[in-house]
C-alpha cells in the first residue's frame, strides 16, 4: 500500500503546489492538514480591505470543501500537527498517527510582535492571515484612530489603506525613514511626504516603551515620553518563519527551514515551501518565488527532478498614492543612484559603486512599463 503525500499548511504555497501537482499527477493521494479552516484566499488582499470595504468572507476565492473536491485531496481542517517522526515517516494529529510517502512543510510565517511593556499588549492586532482579520474586523471597522507599528512594506500599505478609508492613522518605526528595507531614504521621504499630505501622522526614529489601556483608549508610549492615543494598535513589524515542527523533527533550520535547490530539507523525504523555507540562503516572502518553487517541486514529486530557478522578480507595492515597482538590491551604502523624472513618474537605477553594474531599480507611477527591460538585466538565482 502506497502512502499519501502529506502537506502541512493551506496557504498560497501549499495550494499552489497542489494545483501544479494535479496537472501532472491525478492519482497520487494527497492529504492536507491545516490549523485553520482551509478556505483559499489571497493574503496580499489583506493590505487593501479597508478602502474596498471588504469583510473576511469577501476575500475567500474557494471554500475548503470546494478546493478539496476540485483537486481530489483529503483536507483535514482546524487541526494541529503535534509531531513529525522523520525516521518512521509519520505525523501525529490529535489521537492519530498518519504515514506519508513524502511530506511538505508549508507552515508559513507568523507576525512578529516584540514583548512590549504595558497592560494592553494582548490587544495588539496583527493581519497576517484571514483568520486574524476576521477576529479583528469589528474593532477595525468601528475604530477612528489607529496606530500602526512598523513602517515596512506591510505597515505602509496598511497605513495608506486605512487613511484612504478616512481613519486617523499614526505610523511608527524606530527607523528614520519609511520602507527602509526597500527604498533609499531620499525616495522613502517622498512616499512619507505624500502620505503626510493625505493625513497620515509619522513617529519615526522612535521606539515603543509601553502599550497600555486606559478606559476606552489604547495608549502607545514612545521612548521620548510622547503618548499616542488610539482606538486600535496594529503591529506590522515583520514576520518569523514557523520552524518549530521542523526543529522538533531534527531538520536543519536557520532563519527558515533550510532547503536545497529541489526544496528538499535535510531529510530526503521532507520538503519545505513558501515563507517557512530558506532557499539559496534567504526566506522568500513574495508571491513569484513561491509560485516558481511550487511548480518546480510539483515536477520533482511527479518524477522529474527539477531545481528551482529564480529570475529577478518584480515587487509591486500596494501604495496607490505613489505606485511603486522595484526589483534587485535597492538599499545599501555600496549603491549609487541614477534617477530620471518626468510627468509619468521616475525611473531610479541603482548601480554598484565599484563594478558599475546594475544592482536594482525602482519605478513609480506610470513608469511601470520601464520595469521589464530593466528586470531582464538583473541576475537570477539557481540552476
PLM segments and residue spans:
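Rossmann-like dinucleotide-binding cores of NAD(P)H-dependent redox enzymes
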Residues: 60, 154-210, 290, 308-316, ...
Amino acid at each position: 500500500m502506497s502512502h499519501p503525500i502529506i502537506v502541512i499548511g493551506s496557504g498560497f504555497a501549499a495550494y499552489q503546489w497542489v494545483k501544479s501537482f494535479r496537472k501532472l499527477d491525478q492519482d497520487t493521494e494527497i492529504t492536507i492538514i491545516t490549523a485553520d479552516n482551509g478556505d483559499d484566499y489571497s493574503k496580499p488582499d489583506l493590505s487593501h480591505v479597508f478602502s474596498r470595504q471588504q469583510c473576511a468572507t469577501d476575500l475567500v476565492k474557494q471554500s475548503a470543501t470546494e478546493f478539496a473536491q476540485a483537486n481530489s485531496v483529503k483536507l483535514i481542517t482546524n487541526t494541529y500537527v503535534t509531531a513529525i517522526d522523520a525516521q518512521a515517516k509519520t505525523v501525529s494529529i490529535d489521537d492519530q498517527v498518519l504515514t506519508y510517502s513524502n511530506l511538505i512543510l508549508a507552515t508559513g510565517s507568523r507576525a512578529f510582535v516584540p514583548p512590549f511593556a504595558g497592560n494592553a499588549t494582548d490587544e495588539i492586532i496583527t493581519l497576517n492571515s484571514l483568520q486574524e482579520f476576521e477576529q479583528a474586523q469589528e474593532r477595525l471597522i468601528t475604530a477612528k484612530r489607529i496606530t500602526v507599528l512598523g513602517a515596512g512594506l506591510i505597515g505602509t500599505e496598511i497605513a495608506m489603506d486605512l487613511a484612504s478609508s478616512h481613519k486617523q492613522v499614526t505610523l511608527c518605526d524606530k527607523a528614520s525613514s519609511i520602507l527602509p528595507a526597500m527604498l533609499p531614504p531620499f525616495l522613502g521621504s517622498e512616499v512619507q511626504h505624500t502620505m503626510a499630505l493625505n493625513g497620515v501622522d509619522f513617529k519615526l526614529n522612535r521606539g515603543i516603551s509601553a502599550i497600555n489601556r486606559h478606559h476606552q483608549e489604547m495608549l502607545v508610549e514612545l521612548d521620548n515620553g510622547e503618548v499616542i492615543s488610539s482606538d486600535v494598535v496594529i503591529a506590522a513589524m515583520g514576520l518569523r518563519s514557523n520552524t518549530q515542527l521542523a526543529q522538533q523533527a531534527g531538520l536543519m533550520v536557520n532563519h527558515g527551514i533550510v532547503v536545497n535547490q529541489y526544496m528538499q530539507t535535510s531529510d530526503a523525504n521532507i520538503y519545505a515551501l513558501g515563507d517557512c523555507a530558506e532557499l539559496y540562503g534567504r526566506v522568500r516572502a513574495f508571491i513569484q518565488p513561491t509560485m516558481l518553487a511550487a511548480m518546480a517541486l510539483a515536477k520533482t514529486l511527479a518524477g522529474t527532478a527539477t531545481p528551482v530557478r529564480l529570475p529577478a522578480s518584480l515587487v509591486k507595492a500596494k501604495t496607490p498614492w505613489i505606485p511603486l515597482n522595484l526589483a534587485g538590491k535597492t538599499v545599501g551604502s555600496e549603491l549609487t543612484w541614477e534617477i530620471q523624472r518626468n510627468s509619468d513618474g521616475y525611473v531610479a537605477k541603482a548601480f554598484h559603486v565599484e563594478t558599475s553594474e546594475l544592482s536594482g531599480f525602482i519605478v513609480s507611477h506610470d513608469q511601470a512599463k520601464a520595469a521589464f527591460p530593466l528586470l531582464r538585466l538583473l541576475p537570477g538565482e539557481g540552476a
